[in-house]
Amino acid sequence: MEQIIIQIISATIGSIGFALVFNVKRDKFRYVITGAFLGITTYFIVDYLTHSTFLSNVIASIVCTASAEFLARWRKAPATLFLIIHIIPLVPGGSLFYCMRSFVLKDQEAFKSYGLSTLYSAAGIAVGILVVTSFLSILYSYKRPEQR
């Protein structure tokens, strides 16, 4: 449990670094970091309950995308500003590194294992983003009766 808390804090600090690199303005800074914290915390909770990399990434990216879309409308800023920083902690950088390392060292078994882990993570993130953006697109495509 202690290791998970350290990973959550580290991921949040890493998101702060990316927020600084992307020049996120002060009035949006705390919202961007809070979303990243929520996303990685959701990931670890779902991973603890299900032990599924794919499902953990799907649900965490749904939380990240929904919060990014909400914040974009509330703070009147592009959703990608929030979404990129929210998703950063979910990106499977470690497994991608070890996948490529195994490939270079010609360790086929490790390459396959890390490669599948990377693909599951990336696909989970993509599916989560797709679900929320598609839902919101359909939702906002219908005009309210009084606006017709």
Model-derived regions, located:
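Non-catalytic interaction surface on structured domains
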Residues: 44, 69, 74-82, 95, ...
